[in-house]
Amino acid sequence: MSKENKMTQTKDKIKCIPAHVIAQRKVCFREAASIIKMAHDNGCKAVMISGSSSANTDSILSIINLRITVGTSVVIDVEGYEEENVNNTIRDIFKLLTTPED
């Protein structure tokens, strides 16, 4: 492969197996902002699904509109370019949702 081809070649996105979590805390603006930051810091995009609604990490309001409260079932689907980043994002969001509110 030529040097030019190596430079223009793009990596395939890594998509995780969706993770399922039962929320142990209510997701308000602070938590939604944290979820968006976690995904962006790891170079990933996440989609959260609750019931028939979904939200992505491009919109804080879409996450708020999921109305996640204690006991809400949430599916987290993350994709990114590096497996480690995808795993970190899933772990961080999962931890945030399963840590009870103070």
Give a label for each model feature:
Residues S2-T8:
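N-terminal leader/presequence segments that are low-structure
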Residues Q9-K11, M38:
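Short, conserved, surface-exposed binding loops centered on an aromatic residue
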Residues K13-A23:
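Short glycine-/aliphatic-rich beta-strand segments at the starts of folded cytosolic domains
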Residues I17-A19, A39, S53, I93-L97:
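Generic detector of bulky aromatic hydrophobic side chains
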Residues R25-V47, S53-T72, V86-T89:
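Amphipathic alpha-helical interaction surfaces in cytosolic regulatory modules
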Residues T72-D102:
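C-terminal structural segments of small proteins and small subunits
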